[in-house]
From Swiss-Prot:
Amino acids binding NAD(+): 48-53, 74-75, 111-112, 140-141, 245, 275-277
Catalytic activity: a 2,3-saturated acyl-[ACP] + NAD(+) = a (2E)-enoyl-[ACP] + NADH + H(+)
Annotated active site: Y236
Organism, as annotated: Coxiella burnetii (strain CbuG_Q212) (Coxiella burnetii (strain Q212))
Protein's name according to its UniProt entry: Enoyl-[acyl-carrier-protein] reductase [NADH]
Any Pfam family matching the protein: Eno-Rase_NADH_b
Keyword Oxidoreductase appears in the UniProt entry: yes
EC nos: 1.3.1.9
Highest taxon of the lineage: Bacteria
Its job: Involved in the final reduction of the elongation cycle of fatty acid synthesis (FAS II). Catalyzes the reduction of a carbon-carbon double bond in an enoyl moiety that is covalently linked to an acyl carrier protein (ACP).
Length: 406
C-alpha cells in the first residue's frame, strides 16, 4: 500500500518501512565509516533499543565495535492496513544488515518493565552467550509503567513543580508561536513520573542480570539524561521529569558502588544533547528551543544527531582507554557543545524576539520538521513515497509477536 505521514498533535501514526530502513542504513554507514573502536564492548544489552539513542548505541556497538547485541523494546508489528511502529521497522532493518555482516543480533519485544521480559532476556543471554555482558545501555522513554511486583500503574507527566509555568512554544507543523501555560504537578504526579522515568527499573534490570551471573568483570552500564539551559529548566530539569532524572542519577551512584565492589564495574549517567525524538516532541517549549539550537549549532558546524552523539560517547568517553571524564556530579557530558557559552548566549538573544512571523528565518524549524518526519521514515532521499510498499516486515529473531502495545 502507499504510506503517507498522518500527524496528530506531536505523533505520526504511520511509519514507512523502506524509509525507516534507509534511515537505519544511514546510521550504520556513519558507524562503519568511523575508525574502528579498539577495546570496545563485545556483548551488549540495550534496553530500549529500537529508536533514538538506544538504537544509535546498538548500531555503534555492532558496526563500530563488532559487538554481539541483544535489544529489548516494545513495538507494534503491522496489522491489516495499520503500519508497524517505526521501532519495529528500524529493528527489522538493523537485524537484517547485522546478520548479513555476520554479527549476532537478537531482539525481544515486550514490556521491559515486566519481570517476564527480564527473565526472557536473561534466559537468552545464558543460552546464547553464557553470560559475559560487558555493556548495558538503558534508554527507556515511556508514558506509563506497571510495577512488576505490586501491579500499580504509574503515568508520567511533563509538568513544572510548585508554580504555573509561562513561556512560549511552537506548533512545529504550522510554525505558530504562541504563549503556553502549564499547571504544576500534584504530589501523586511527581511520584508517578519518578516511578516511570526514574532509576527504579534500571536497578531491577541490573540486579536481575547480576543475580543470574549475566554480567562480565568490568561491566559498564549507562543511562541517559538531559539537563539543558535555564530556559527549559522549569518544564524539564526542575519539573517532574527532572525530579525523575535526579532519582536516575541517585540510582547510578548506588549501582556504581555495587558493581565496583562485585565486578570492578561502573554505572554511569550520560548527559546527552537535545534532539528531535518522539519523546522530546511532546514537551512544550522544547521544540522551539531545539529549532533555535539546530540553527546555531549547524552554523557553527557542531551539530550532531543521535548516531554522532553515541559515536562520541563510545569513542571519546566509554572506550577511550583513559579514565572516563565526568563533571563534578560524576556525569558524562556529551551535551558539552550544546551548552557552550557562545551557543547558549545566541539562543537567549533570539528567544526574546522569536515569533510566528520570523520563526522560519530565525530558527531551523524546517530542520526540526525534517528530523521529525525522518523518525517515521518519511522525507528520505531515494525513496519513492508514491509507490506502494509491503508494510509487513519480519524481524529475523522474533517469531511470535506479543499483545500489541498501544
Amino acid at each position: 500500500m502507499i504510506v503517507q505521514p498522518k500527524v496528530r498533535g506531536f505523533i505520526c501514526t504511520t511509519a514507512h518501512p523502506e524509509g525507516c530502513a534507509r534511515h537505519v542504513g544511514e546510521w550504520i554507514n556513519y558507524a562503519k565509516q568511523q575508525p574502528s573502536l579498539t577495546g570496545g564492548p563485545q556483548k551488549v544489552l540495550i534496553i530500549g533499543a529500537s529508536t533514538g539513542f538506544g538504537l544509535a548505541s546498538r548500531i555503534v556497538a555492532a558496526f563500530g565495535a563488532g559487538a554481539k547485541t541483544i535489544g529489548v523494546f516494545f513495538e507494534r508489528p503491522a496489522s491489516g492496513k495499520r503500519t508497524a511502529s517505526p521501532g519495529w521497522y528500524n529493528t527489522a532493518a538493523f537485524e537484517k544488515t547485522a546478520l548479513a555482516a555476520g554479527l549476532y543480533a537478537k531482539s525481544i519485544n515486550g514490556d521491559a518493565f515486566s519481570d517476564e521480559i527480564k527473565q526472557q532476556t536473561i534466559d537468552l543471554i545464558q543460552k546464547d552467550w553464557q553470560g559475559g555482558v560487558d555493556l548495558v545501555i538503558y534508554s527507556i522513554a515511556s508514558p506509563r509503567r506497571v510495577h512488576p511486583r505490586t501491579g500499580e500503574i504509574f503515568n508520567s507527566v511533563l509538568k513544572p513543580i510548585g508554580q504555573t509555568y509561562h513561556n512560549k512554544t511552537v506548533d512545529v507543523m504550522t510554525g505558530e508561536v504562541s504563549p503556553v501555560s502549564i499547571e504544576p504537578a500534584t504530589e501523586k504526579e511527581i511520584r508517578d513520573t519518578e516511578a516511570v522515568m526514574g532509576g527504579d527499573d534500571w536497578a531491577l534490570w541490573i540486579n536481575a542480570l547480576f543475580k543470574y551471573n549475566c554480567l562480565a568483570e568490568g561491566v559498564k552500564t549507562v543511562a541517559f539524561t538531559y539537563i539543558g539551559p535555564e530556559l527549559t529548566h522549569a518544564v524539564y530539569r526542575n519539573g517532574t521529569i527532572g525530579r525523575a532524572k535526579l532519582h536516575l542519577e541517585k540510582t547510578a551512584r548506588e549501582l556504581d558502588t555495587q558493581l565496583e565492589s562485585a565486578l570492578s564495574g561502573q554505572a554511569l549517567i550520560s548527559v546527552n544533547k537535545a534532539l528531535v525524538t518522539q519523546a522530546s516532541a511532546a514537551i512544550p517549549v522544547v521544540p522551539l528551543y531545539i529549532s533555535l539550537l539546530y540553527k546555531i549549532m549547524k552554523e557553527k558546524n557542531i551539530h550532531e544527531g543521535c548516531i554522532e552523539q553515541m559515536w562520541r560517547l563510545f569513542k571519546e568517553r566509554l572506550y577511550s582507554n583513559q579514565n572516563i571524564p565526568t563533571d563534578s556530579e560524576g556525569r558524562i557530558r556529551i551535551d558539552d557543545w550544546e551548552m557552550r557559552e557562545d551557543v547558549q548566549a545566541e539562543i537567549k538573544r533570539l528567544w526574546e524576539s522569536i515569533n510566528t512571523g520570523n520563526v522560519e528565518t530565525l530558527s531551523d524549524i524546517a530542520g526540526y520538521r525534517e528530523d521529525f518526519y525522518k523518525l517515521f521514515g518519511f522525507g528520505l532521499n531515494g525513496i519513492d513515497y508514491e509507490r506502494g510498499v509491503e508494510i509487513e516486515k519480519a524481524i529475523p529473531s522474533i517469531t511470535v509477536t506479543p499483545e500489541n502495545p498501544e
